[in-house]
UniProtKB/Swiss-Prot annotation:
A GO cellular component entry from the record: membrane
Paired cysteines (S-S): 631-642, 636-649, 651-660, 786-797, 791-804, 806-815, 822-833, 827-840, 842-851, 900-914, 908-921, 923-932, 979-989, 983-996, 998-1007, 1047-1058, 1052-1065, 1067-1076, 1165-1175, 1169-1182, 1184-1193
Name the record gives this protein: EGF-like domain-containing protein comC
Membrane topology, Cytoplasmic segments: 1468-1501
Top-level taxonomy: Eukaryota, Amoebozoa, Evosea, Eumycetozoa, Dictyostelia
Glycosylation (residues): 47, 64, 169, 192, 255, 315, 397, 453, 470, 497, 612, 635, 643, 685, 693, 700, 726, 765, 835, 843, 877, 916, 956, 991, 1017, 1122, 1270, 1309, 1334, 1437
Protein keywords: Developmental protein, Disulfide bond, EGF-like domain, Glycoprotein, Membrane, Repeat, Signal, Transmembrane, Transmembrane helix
Entry's transmembrane regions: 1447-1467
SMART domains: EGF
Keyword Transmembrane: yes
């Protein structure tokens, strides 16, 4: 209760604090004058003191009350006024967004930019009737007027990125003229035109993002110019035609259009509208005014398979699942059909179909089957009933899921702890692809709610493979799973946290307890992620244990019966094919948690006794962990030992065998010094004798041996005179034998020309006989054979040729066929004579013995008979014509012949044609009846029906219609309808239409309602419901008079607010884009590469959405290899010098000026070390010779004659001061500026004299002064000045330097600075002074070093020309004493070292101001250092003009840190990261001045 009251108390304080704020006096008076001039007393009432509490009404800066944000002013006059708003009325206010409503506006306000700080101007005034000049350069300009008419030139909008022109009068409008020059068409991005009379031609406008076009009711359809739509090349085109005009649906669009919204009253198409060629279109929205735009109840368009469809307020009767009658949809599309009359039940899904459907606001009934589980289905506000499938119920605790099914009558739509029994995700890890694969059932689709543990993380969001059933995520390449065995995933819906294995691993229990009631509890790992994830079985001894619960790390089960407790029992856990065995004690309550060494190596080698932690090794294995192999012979004799690594006896050199019981004798060595010559030869180590293989011989098997073939007589080479060569293994036969074994006799066949069998046969040397080849004969195969068997006895074979010579009465090659001649051997040239029969074979068109007679076939009837058969039908084969009998007709005599009715011997009475096939008359158009003797008169025809059909009748003899009770007229074409209630006496009834024509002031079907007017007649954005007086706004139009425009995303991505004047989102700081979904990205630090090229790292804010990312360094593309929300890694080629860097994504570009500096391989030294040292070109530092010092070795190191410096801190100004003699050097942090990309100063914070001392810390080493001041209500800047009491080394970005005693170290912290734009940057100004004190020098011997009052000498050359080793030097010399300033060219930006540039802001005779260009960072750490030294012109003895010069070592090191403080957090997180080659901002010695004499007084810079 106390906390509650405290909270209310603080709210009260905050409220009163807000009310107490007032604008600065000049702004107060400016707004007061405006309120007074225009009498705005209602919105701005006076308070009790007679003044105004402006900041309680308009937006004021909560710190200083300045009206520097959004200002909206509205006239309170209800009648026309002559008081005009002019530019000077409000130019005294610093707002950045102005909205003027219903004032009389001066035209100069439109064309002159009076409000310099303003970027957005909106005017709603009917005093604007035309736009005749170029509008003032406000980036966003809105003009709303009911009297804005005529032709508007696009050249008048060349200064705008966003333009909104609205004529809210539905009876008039304007057109657009494309007259701008090409170079002036680039800037316009978001045009919004309302009240158009035709589609504008936007040829040449290439930067359009999301234009919108609203057309007036006054447009003429004939001059609408729909063809111009294809000139609108934009990411998204929106066209809204009025509901009062019917137009053809446009069919031609620009190829670059990705998103299309079109609203109108479209004519009913007669054919499908093919938009499939517009393959770049990703989404098309069709917003209907009536129900006609369909074909047979289907969406009448055909799109590409990549175009999403959004259709609303139409008439679609068929629920489309996989497509329509015109097109098959793809899985890449989403389908939305809202408020369009869909009815019936949702059919089950099958096949390849889209995975997104939105059927909200229809009349779909029935249940939702589980076939819809793997789709994104939305059925809000339908008539569905029954139970939702478990795949949906599991995720109803997610409000985004639940709202998809509200507005129905589902019985299980429970959003709090919904029952879930089917949730079963499965995980697979592919280490080669560094990918986690998620499959399973009913795990949902809300990937952002799948959270991995810290072991793993997805580089990006989960990637869909198959919607609802297969997703993958890739973990970073730097992550290794070699040592990761498992990990967990937290599924926010349905609220389950599961641990999954990353490897295949047997169950690993580490604790097993048998409890009461035969329960068993097992703890460990690699069991089952949940019951059913793997197949599990558990047994203890021979008793099964039924699993009750299971997770990755525990199992509970119940034994079927009590186990024995006398001895340890074997526990067996099986998961899929993996088995784990262990022996346990089954004593109730005993914890078997003793793990064995190395888990007994493996399940095949041993089993662990988990009651005492010892292994029971399986047969063949030995050792504490069963890792050793038992020898096959337990005792190795003759001094042998058992090697348990391999399980074999190791014998000494004179013994062998498994148990070392046999002696060992070596056999002789042969070829290649191998025992028994190696190869397949073997040695008998017991006898020492070689046993050669079949191919070798000899004592050491070194001689080859090949056996010859053995003959049938079992003799080698068959014995006799045959011989064998054992070296080659080949037999050599004598002259009377042959064959590989010489076993066959050899007999020569007959020869011809010394060739056996004449070369035409095969000789059988065993018999001496020839076997002739086919076609040859005789004993020596020298003759030829005939093809027949001795010419069949009808001829003689000529063996010299192999041809039959037939006798005269025979023919053919074998003389087998008799020869007969025809009567006419030529067959009249119409056939062929067959000599085998002597008969002519005629062709198809002739006949007869000699083929001399023509032949024509008669037609064949349907009964397959010539001339249809019958006795009376005759065929003439010479003419091919049938002659029919009297009862048949037709060419094939297949048709009956029937006579028609005849009168006066004239068929059909002479008024018709007789059909002898049917015997019926076809009367002419003027006669009727069977014999055509009655006259025929036609009745009137309407709708292609005689007398309009229905129950109307026609008298064809008179030609007169007789109408039924519901029709009238000569053709019965007019309905007869009475009006309901006779129009209630408030109108006139048309009985033909049954429609009432109401009197003025009445409406309704029966004139039963009076007319109520709507506000502003619904502007042009809706239809008036004159019954209720309420506007029904068109889609994307809002407010009670439909005057407002709804943004594409009304919530603006939850990162902005919708401006209903133009339908555009006003994004929160840090977001951009039409729907505010993109972060306003920027880079805060860059780690460059060497001049040879390589990997570049960019850190900053880039968000989760990175469409078409691109990085440019100067003019070179840096190829992106990886991108996250806060870093980019890219690869660039070689280059050199300082470059701009740009990061482009999501269509927006960010540029960092001079932010990239290639790392040099070699560095030069300042002034080449003045020949007083050696240059270290790796670091760019001088290594001075003895006696010299300084960054360029131009100072002497002798310091014993110099008085010490005195460091101080001014507690009022926070200035660091070092005094030395009469000289005072002062270092101040004076200004912080927020600068634009074009280097303009947007904001400036004067830091000088505004510091507040917080604390002084003094100890033996240091003395620290802490100051701070507020920059805005949410950011501050603090400064610490530390007086160094002992020498010490400071490291900054891998750069080391020494801070000497009596130095001052300055640290600056800029906390939580909020930039006005992501392209802006901060510039910090540091000022250094040198001047005289009023002290009298006690070192008179050095008076010759005092100047004569002349100015100090300042050199800032290196600062302006930074080319040396990351260090810039500025020096101030006074009385030969030097304030030496070194500025490093790197800062630590948000924890990362990055390059910065610096420049001289101002320089006069005794001071210099340096500006450090900080990156767009939240935390910046800058580290310049300052030193007071002696010039080489300093004289040790004034009498000796040639004496050596000395240096006073007094150093001031300044560290400026921007460690941003997170608002509302008690934790300060600071992170430093250093890289090679830091920027050093150094002070350089200027030219020497040898003037002497007494000090003429102080010179203040």
């Amino acid at each position: 209760m106390i906390k509650k009251y405290l909270f209310l108390f603080f709210i009260f304080l905050i409220f009163n604090f807000v009310l107490s704020i007032q604008p600065p006096l000049s702004e107060y008076n400016c707004l007061k004058n405006f309120v007074t001039k225009f009498k705005l007393s209602t919105k701005f009432p006076t308070n009790s003191t007679g003044g105004y509490d402006f900041c309680s009404i308009v937006s004021c800066n909560p710190v200083n009350g300045s009206i520097n944000g959004f200002l909206s002013l509205q006239s309170e006059s209800t009648t026309p006024t002559t008081v005009t708003v002019v530019g000077t009325d409000l130019s005294c206010l610093p707002f950045n967004n102005l909205n003027l409503q219903n004032f009389l506006i001066s035209t100069t306000l439109l064309y002159t930019k009076f409000f310099t700080s303003c970027s957005t101007l909106a005017i709603n005034s009917d005093s604007i009737t035309s736009i005749t000049q170029v509008l003032a350069p406000y980036e966003t300009f809105t003009i709303v007027s009911k009297k804005l008419n005529g032709a508007l030139k696009m050249s008048n909008f060349i200064n705008q990125k966003s333009i909104l022109i609205t004529n809210s009068n539905s009876t008039s409008g304007y057109t657009l003229v494309n007259d701008a020059l090409a170079e002036n068409k680039i800037k316009l991005e978001t045009p919004n035109f309302s009240g158009l009379l035709s589609v504008p031609d936007l040829t040449g406008y290439t930067s359009l993002g999301y234009p919108a076009f609203y057309f007036s009711d006054a447009l003429e359809v004939t001059s609408l110019a729909l063809a111009n739509i294809k000139t609108i090349g934009a990411v998204s085109s929106r066209l809204y035609f009025p509901s009062t005009k019917t137009i053809q649906f446009p069919t031609s669009y620009h190829n670059d259009t990705s998103y299309l919204t079109i609203q109108g009253k479209f004519t009913k198409p007669t054919a499908v509208i093919d938009l499939s060629k517009f393959v770049n279109c990703r989404n098309i929205q069709i917003l209907n005014y009536d129900k006609t735009f369909n074909i047979n109840g289907e969406i009448p368009i055909k799109t590409s398979p990549f175009t999403d469809i959004y259709y609303t307020d139409g008439n679609i009767t068929k629920i489309p699942i996989g497509g329509t009658s015109f097109v098959t949809w793809s899985t890449e599309q989403s389908i939305t059909i809202k408020k369009s009359g869909l009815s019936g039940t949702l059919p089950p899904l099958s096949g390849v179909i889209p995975t997104y459907y939105d059927f909200s606001g229809n009349s779909i009934s029935g249940t939702l089957s589980n076939t819809w589980c793997n789709t994104n289905i939305i059925v809000t506000d339908n008539l569905m009933t029954g139970t939702l499938p478990s795949c949906i119920v599991c995720h109803l605790n997610n409000s985004e899921v639940a709202k998809k099914f509200t507005g129905n009558k589902f019985t299980n739509l429970v959003t709090s702890n919904p029952p879930c029994t089917t949730f079963a995700p499965k995980i697979k890890v592919d280490k080669s692809q560094k990918t986690i694969i998620l499959t399973g059932t009913d795990f949902g689709t809300y990937t952002s709610g799948w959270i991995l543990n810290t072991t793993l993380s997805c580089e990006k969001l989960w990637t869909k493979v198959t919607y609802g059933s297969n997703y993958t995520c890739t973990y970073p390449s730097t992550t290794t799973l070699d040592k990761v065995s498992y990990f967990w995933i937290n599924f926010n819906t349905p609220g389950r946290n599961y641990t999954f294995p990353a490897i295949s691993q047997v169950p690993t229990p580490n604790s097993i307890i048998v409890g009461t009631s035969n329960s068993v509890t097992i703890s460990g790992t690699f069991f089952s992620t949940y019951i059913g994830y793997v197949t599990q079985s558990i047994s203890v001894g021979s008793i099964s244990c039924t699993v009750g619960t299971s997770s990755f790390s525990s199992i509970t089960c119940t034994l079927d019966s009590a186990p024995s407790t006398n001895t340890e029992q074997k526990l067996i856990i099986t998961t899929n094919s993996l088995i784990k065995e262990a022996y346990i004690s089954t004593v109730v309550g005993f914890n078997n948690n003793k793990l064995c060494p190395n888990d007994c190596t493996s399940s095949t080698r041993g089993i662990c006794y988990m009651n005492n932690g010892t292994c029971k090794c399986n047969s063949g294995y030995v050792g504490l962990d069963c890792s050793g192999l038992q020898c096959k012979v337990p005792n190795c004799s003759n001094g042998g030992t058992c090697n348990t690594t391999v399980g074999l006896c190791v014998c000494d050199s004179s013994h062998q065998s498994l148990d070392c019981s046999l002696d060992f004798k070596q056999c002789p060595k042969g070829l290649n010094s191998l025992i028994c010559s190696g190869g397949g030869n073997s040695c008998n180590n017991q006898t020492g004798i070689c046993t050669c293989n079949s191919s070798h011989q000899g004592l050491n098997c070194s001689i080859n041996y090949k056996q010859c073939p053995i003959g049938s007589n079992s003799l080698i080479c068959s014995g006799g005179g045959n011989s064998c060569n054992n070296q080659t293994g080949i037999c050599k036969c004598d002259s009377s034998h042959q064959g590989s074994d010489c076993a066959n006799d050899f007999i020569q066949c007959p020869l011809k020309n010394s060739i056996p069998c004449s070369g035409h046969g095969i000789c059988n040397n065993k018999t001496g006989d020839c076997t002739c080849d086919s076609g040859f004969t005789n004993q020596d195969c020298s003759g030829y054979t005939c093809t027949s068997n001795n010419c069949n006895g009808h001829g003689v074979c000529d063996t010299s040729k192999g041809i039959c010579q037939c006798y005269p009465e025979w023919q053919d090659i074998d003389c087998q066929t008799p020869f007969k001649n025809c009567l006419d051997p030529t067959c009249s040239n119409n056939g062929i004579c067959k000599n085998t029969t002597g008969i002519c074979e005629c062709n198809s068109s002739h006949q007869g013995l000699t083929c001399s007679i023509d032949f024509n076939q008669c037609p064949i009837g349907s009964n397959s008979l010539i001339c249809s058969g019958g006795s009376g039908n005759i065929c003439n084969n010479q003419t091919g014509i049938c002659t029919c009998d009297s009862s048949h007709q037709g060419p094939d005599c297949g048709t009956d012949f029937i006579k028609c009715p005849t009168q006066n011997l004239t068929p059909c009475n002479g008024f018709g044609n007789c059909n002898n096939i049917t015997g019926s008359c076809s009367c002419d158009q003027n006669h009727q009846s069977e014999d055509c003797n009655i006259v025929y008169k036609e009745c009137p025809i309407i709708n292609s029906l005689i007398c309009n059909g229905f129950d109307n009748s026609c008298n064809n003899q008179t030609g007169v219609c007789t109408c039924d009770d519901l029709h009238q007229g000569l053709d019965c074409g007019l309905e007869y309808k009475p009006c309901i209630n006779n129009c209630n006496g408030n109108g006139v009834c048309n009985n033909q239409t049954s429609i009432c024509t109401c009197y003025e002031a009445y409406q309704g079907e029966t004139c039963q309602f009076q007319i109520n007017q709507c506000p502003n007649n619904c502007t042009t954005g809706g239809d008036c419901d004159t019954i209720t007086g309420i506007c029904n706004c068109y889609p994307l139009r809002i407010n009670n008079d439909c005057s407002g425009y709804e943004c594409l995303d009304p919530n603006c991505g939850d990162h902005g607010i919708c401006n209903d004047m133009n339908g555009l989102c006003i994004c929160d700081k840090g977001y951009r884009g039409d729907n505010c979904i993109y972060v306003d990205h920027y880079a805060s630090s860059v780690i460059p590469t060497k001049e040879e090229g390589g990997t570049v790292l960019i850190y900053g804010l880039f968000g989760e959405i990175n469409n078409d990312p691109n990085v440019q360094v100067g003019n070179s593309n840096c190829l992106i290899s990886n991108i996250t929300s806060n870093s980019i890694e890219c690869i660039i080629g070689k280059g050199s010098g300082i470059k701009d860097i740009s990061v482009t994504q999501n269509g927006f570009e960010w540029i960092g000026k001079s932010m990239f500096n290639y790392i040099k391989s070699k560095q030069s030294c300042p002034n080449n070390c003045n020949s007083n040292g050696i240059c270290n070109d790796l670091q760019g530092k001088c290594e001075c010779y003895p006696g010299f010092t300084g960054h360029d070795c131009n100072s002497l190191s002798k310091t014993d004659l110099i008085s010490p410096s005195t460091p101080k801190v001014n507690e009022n100004t926070a200035n660091g001061i070092i005094e030395n003699g009469e000289n005072k050097f002062e270092i101040m942090v004076i200004t912080l500026q927020e600068k634009t990309f074009t280097n303009g100063v947007l904001k400036q914070y004067n830091l000088e004299n505004n510091w507040k001392l917080l604390e002084i810390i003094n100890d033996e080493n240091n003395n620290i002064f802490k100051f701070k001041q507020n920059l805005t209500d949410s950011s501050e800047i603090s400064i610490n000045l530390e007086i160094i009491k002992k020498d010490r080394i400071i490291n900054f970005a891998d750069y080391s330097f020494e801070i000497s005693k009596d130095s001052i170290k300055v640290s600056i912290n800029i906390s939580n600075y909020i930039y006005s734009n992501s392209l802006n940057y901060l510039q910090l100004h540091l000022k250094s002074n040198a001047y005289k004190t009023n002290k009298t020098s006690s070192d008179d011997e050095f008076d010759c070093n005092l100047d004569d009052g002349s100015d100090a000498k300042i050199d800032n050359q290196d600062l302006e020309n930074s080319n040396i080793n990351h260090e810039n030097f500025v020096t101030i010399i006074k009385d030969n004493k030097i304030l030496n300033g070194r500025y490093i060219d790197h800062v630590i930006s948000d924890g990362i070292s990055t390059f910065i540039s610096s420049r001289t802001i101002e320089k006069d005779s005794n001071s210099i101001t340096v500006g450090l260009n900080l990156p767009h960072c939240k935390n910046c750490l800058i580290d310049p250092d300052f030193s007071v030294l002696l010039s080489t012109d300093f004289k040790e003895n004034c009498s000796d003009s040639n004496s050596n010069n000395y240096i006073i070592p007094v150093s001031i090191t300044v560290s400026i840190g921007g460690a941003a403080v997170l608002v509302g957090s008690a934790i300060f997180f600071y992170r430093k990261k250093f890289i090679e080659n830091t920027l050093k901002i150094q002070l350089k010695r200027l030219s020497k001045n040898n003037s002497s004499g007494s000090d003429g007084g102080n010179t203040q810079s």
